Amino acid sequence: MKSFNTEGHNHSTAESGDAYTVSDPTKNVDEDGREKRTGTWLTASAHIITAVIGSGVLSLAWAIAQLGWIAGTSILLIFSFITYFTSTMLADCYRAPDPVTGKRNYTYMDVVRSYLGGRKVQLCGVAQYGNLIGVTVGYTITASISLVAVGKSNCFHDKGHTADCTISNYPYMAVFGIIQVILSQIPNFHKLSFLSIMAAVMSFTYATIGIGLAIATVAGGKVGKTSMTGTAVGVDVTAAQKIWRSFQAVGDIAFAYAYATVLIEIQDTLRSSPAENKAMKRASLVGVSTTTFFYILCGCIGYAAFGNNAPGDFLTDFGFFEPFWLIDFANACIAVHLIGAYQVFAQPIFQFVEKKCNRNYPDNKFITSEYSVNVPFLGKFNISLFRLVWRTAYVVITTVVAMIFPFFNAILGLIGAASFWPLTVYFPVEMHIAQTKIKKYSARWIALKTMCYVCLIVSLLAAAGSIAGLISSVKTYKPFRTMHE
């Protein structure tokens, strides 16, 4: 085992996880001294699809059921456009001041610091990393639910659909955590391409299975009642439930597209030719278009199949029972997808902390030293003791939080509401205005500001709906006792 110390690195350009020395002329590096980026629009598209298409795609039938055919499909299309539009603005801000030849910004906070500065940098950090932490906890819960669904599906198949097949989530959360401890040793975002491509394939697979099962239900004629306005007050829901669930549904759709939290980190993996902003815009178009296609299919066909009684997730909530083996496979695909998605959202957190520690403690060998070891089938691998301890601790903590708060998805909705507006809409628009020097009160300025305020209202209403759902969950909460029934 060979040890080497990185304390001589230029910490303004090298972060933990980079296995090269900036001054080493024998290494293949970019103009900023970092390891040469090799990403393309295709790998960036895979990262985006992995980040965006979560198992929530299977809950869109429920969202459309709350809103109806007209509002549901319209909101899906509107937010797909808003997300793509603002992502192109953010892609142009990766370099500053010029989007092609300017200085690179490696994180979302760096971008905000370059264009806006002041307290907005801290606001961005709180929104971004709060969201990333929340997502990693939420994915731990969701993955365990999918794995539990596999066991329950087999139980229902063997004992009948009315059998008591209650299974605890906690062992599955522990297994998911162990897998993440291992994968978290992947040094940085640049090494995640294979994981994202695999996760993207999994997301296509389970979404396609869900769509296929919904089509089969519609073709069989056993469909639920649908309407232009969704669930009916006095029949399906009370007036209060209609309001709160509609708010929550709008928020779910809006947040389902959000990937601004990791956009800059994804763009930082792209090679410089063609220009990163051009490649990222192409990746965003492919990613958002693909996502919208699957969202509309899952949402609309799922609503057509189940009507106003559409379940929250028609795979894990057993909208379907047969064929059980296909449902097992789809739920396993969800779990595998979330294994990759967890890393896409966790890597920016890992690198943020490691970069800070390298800067603050450059002489601490525990933090700066790395060891070169030979790993079977993988070849030479650089291991940092600090990275091993810190990342393992993070995974353990998020897993324990997931076990303590199994209703955390309600909290995640609230976190999504709080972070969607600043990260996906406000900061990209404000930086675009600053970068292109749009005149105040011009037609374009007014249009951009109007979009900002409309999205702010959506976030506030969604937050209200999430709080109502959270209050309902807390009333029945029992720590370490909640089972997936």
Swiss-Prot record:
**Record topological domains on the Extracellular side:** 151-166, 216-245, 307-318, 472-485
**Gene deletion effect:** No effect on plant growth or seed germination, but reduced seed weight and total seed yield. Resistant to toxic concentrations of amino acids in the growth medium.
- Organs and tissues of expression: Highly expressed in developing pods. Found in the endosperm and in the storage parenchyma and the outer epidermis cells of the developing embryo. Lower levels of expression in flowers, in the vascular system of the cotyledon and in the root epidermal cells, including root hairs and throughout the root tip.
Q: How does activity depend on pH?
A: Optimum pH is acidic.
Keywords assigned by UniProt, alphabetized: Amino-acid transport, Cell membrane, Membrane, Symport, Transmembrane, Transmembrane helix, Transport
Q: Which domain of life is it from?
A: Eukaryota
One GO CC annotation, please?
plasma membrane
Primary location recorded for the protein, binned into one broad class: membrane
Q: Mind listing the GO molecular function terms for this protein?
A: amino acid transmembrane transporter activity; L-alanine transmembrane transporter activity; L-glutamate transmembrane transporter activity; L-glutamine transmembrane transporter activity; L-proline transmembrane transporter activity; L-serine transmembrane transporter activity; symporter activity
Question: Transmembrane stretches, by residue range?
Answer: 41-61, 62-82, 130-150, 167-187, 195-215, 246-266, 286-306, 319-339, 395-415, 416-436, 451-471
Entry keyword annotation includes Transmembrane helix: yes
Compositional bias segments (type: Polar residues): 1-15
Q: How is its activity regulated?
A: Inhibited by carbonylcyanide m-chlorophenylhydrazone and diethylpyrocarbonate (DEPC).
Compartment list: Cell membrane
What task does this protein carry out?
A: Amino acid-proton symporter. Stereospecific transporter with a broad specificity for histidine, glutamate and neutral amino acids. Reduced affinities for asparagine and valine. Involved in amino acid uptake from the apoplastic cavity into the embryo cells for storage protein accumulation and in root amino acid uptake.
Q: Which family does it belong to?
A: Belongs to the amino acid/polyamine transporter 2 family. Amino acid/auxin permease (AAAP) (TC 2.A.18.2) subfamily.
Name of the featured protein: Amino acid permease 1
Write down the species: Arabidopsis thaliana
Q: Which gene encodes it?
A: AAP1
